[in-house]
Design a protein with these regions (language model features):
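Generic secretory/membrane-interface signal
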Residues: 34, 38, 106, 114, ...
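Alpha/beta-hydrolase superfamily serine-hydrolase fold, recognizing
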Residues: 64, 71-88, 163-458
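A glycine/proline-hinged amphipathic helix-loop "lid/cap" segment
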Residues: 5, 40-182, 452-458
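Intrinsically disordered, polybasic Lys/Arg-rich low-complexity tracts
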Residues: 5-37
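Acidic, Ala/Val/Gly-enriched low-complexity intrinsically disordered segments
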Residues: 16-19, 27, 40, 45-47, ...
Length: 458
């Protein structure tokens, strides 16, 4: 996209979504069941399993990007996820049974029907379980983390054409009792030396920060999403298990995010990645951290931060940044928060709870490392892929930041999926959401492979 005009808004048409859904549904019907990864603190669970047909190939389009024909043999669904996915491929039936057949329309936008069905089912399940809210907008963090891990087991198909290795890397300030920051390294089979991906036979790398309001989320909750990103983008993905609030409030997560990014940049040979093509990416709170890292390492960076956030000299700026429905301002004063702050999974009440845990000192709300949208200067930051959802309280944050970057001359690709909600990237049980997630991963892969000097064709 040109850096001189407004960012291009990509709105999904019904016809395009239907076609994408058909492709994904066809692939899902051909998938089979396999065991789900066993949770472990180092991230080594499930490493190297299930090569599947098409493993060891460089991928299509000549740049290691996603070949849709590979999806059919390399997706595996846990049995429960298969059943739930089948159910939500028939949203009209689900909505009729729940007595909620009328479509949800807000400001000219119509909520995706499968998403609406999931939303209605979730409301009823919350009514049965009680939701665990303390009344302060946030439940018990430990309970919430376990719930998110359990949900992740049925939320996404598991890519089996990806090799996964867990390890600990050095941290600026290690959590008590820890030897560093846990990470998982994802590499699609065949991605590397001799794979035909160009870039001197070394793929780009994406440092990924999970979402969860800086309070929940970990390597387990986002394992399937990171597998998908590695498989589709043709990049090596390094997922970061940064410290969480309220045990470790701001700026602990920023410190860990920056330390992990610096480590990846400094270990390109060990990781067998292109040293000049390391990007950052994250969803929700992780998008906030990705934007913060891009700001802190931008060319000529002089970003006021909390005293604990330090940037070692010589850390290069990311090659690109991917921000998926990011939260970029702690003020919570946007129009989309007012309109969509209740009833669409992420609520204003829960957002306030996350903010209270992560940013207990209100003075920190205005810092660029906590609220990148409020940064005085953004020129020189990495080219950005900014993705928002139409029914998301954080939609305006992403669009405003895309506009701000564009005005500063930064290359931006902006996509708004008008019929989606916050968190769709982790809702692979919905065919439409999975198709759009693949599209986002492909877009990030294209950005990381841009100007590839040595493209090859299969």
């Amino acid at each position: 996209m040109s850096s001189t005009g407004p960012p291009a808004k990509v709105v999904r048409s019904t016809k395009a979504v239907t076609a994408a859904k058909a492709r994904t549904t066809k692939a899902t019907r051909r998938s089979t069941t396999s065991a789900t990864p066993t949770p472990d603190p180092t991230g080594e669970a499930g490493a190297g399993r299930g090569h599947g047909r098409g493993a060891g190939r460089g991928g299509g389009r000549g740049r290691g990007l996603y070949n849709r024909q590979m999806q059919r043999s390399n997706e595996r669904w846990p049995l429960a996820a298969s059943l739930v996915s089948w159910l939500f491929r028939h949203p009209e039936l689900v909505l009729a049974l729940l007595g909620k057949q009328a479509p949800i329309q807000v400001n000219g936008r119509v909520l995706n029907r499968s998403t609406q069905a999931l939303l209605e089912v979730s409301k009823r399940l919350e009514g049965v379980t009680g939701g665990g809210d303390t009344g302060e907008g946030l439940g018990d963090p430990l309970v919430m983390r376990k719930q998110l891990q359990r949900m992740a087991l049925i939320a996404m198909p598991i890519r089996t054409d990806v090799h996964v290795v867990g390890r600990l890397i050095p941290a600026t300030e290690s959590p008590e009792g820890s030897n560093g920051i846990p990470v998982r390294i994802y590499r699609r089979f065949g991605t590397g030396v001799g794979s035909g991906v160009g870039l001197g036979a070394r793929p780009p790398a994406i440092v990924y920060y999970h979402g969860g309001g800086w309070v929940t989320g970990d390597l387990i909750s986002h394992d399937a999403s990171c597998r998908l990103l590695a498989a589709v983008s043709g990049c090596v993905v390094v997922a970061v298990d940064y410290r969480l609030a309220p045990e470790d409030p701001f700026p602990a997560a920023v410190d860990d995010a920056l330390a992990a990014y610096a480590w990846v940049c400094g270990h390109a040979d060990e990781l067998r990645i292109a040293e000049d093509r390391v990007g950052v990416m994250g969803d929700s709170a992780g998008g906030n951290l990705a934007a913060a890292v891009a700001l802190l390492t931008r060319k000529g960076a002089s970003v006021p931060t909390a005293s604990a956030v330090t940037v070692a000299p010589g850390i290069p700026a990311p090659f690109a940044q991917g921000l998926l429905y990011p939260g970029l301002s702690a003020r919570f004063d946007s129009e989309s928060i007012r309109i969509f702050g209740e009833g669409f999974f992420l609520t204003l009440q829960s957002m306030k709870g996350f903010r209270r845990a992560y940013l207990p000192d209100q003075a920190d709300w205005e810092l660029a490392a906590a609220s990148p949208l409020l940064a005085d200067e953004v020129d020189g930051v990495a080219p950005a892929l900014v993705v928002t959802a139409g029914f998301d309280p954080l939609c305006d944050d992403g669009q405003a930041y895309a506009d701000k970057l564009t005005s500063a001359g930064v290359e931006v690709e902006y996509r708004c999926y008008d019929d989606q909600v916050h968190g769709f990237f982790n809702m692979g049980i919905l065919a439409d959401s999975l198709a759009l997630s693949i599209e986002v991963c492909d877009a990030m892969g294209r950005m990381m492979h841009r100007d590839d000097p040595t493209p090859t064709e299969e």
